[in-house]
């Protein structure tokens, strides 16, 4: 059975981002978390992380819909093999 709560390091690994980026997500309120223990270590509930990921997929899909890819974007993304 998967753990209910994840450390910030676990979250960082899952999202493939740095520990400081994970901390910023928590401190900004974008990723709900709780402080536990006498030293106030952060924990993120696994269901909250899954909800965050789903929100990011939805926000990205909305962004892609409202910002269609133009030819200049495609040209900029293609490597110069010449």
What are these model-derived regions, one by one?
Residues 1-24, 46-82:
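Basic Lys/Arg-rich amphipathic helical interaction modules
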Residues 15-42:
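Major-groove DNA-recognition helix of helix-turn-helix-type DNA-binding domains
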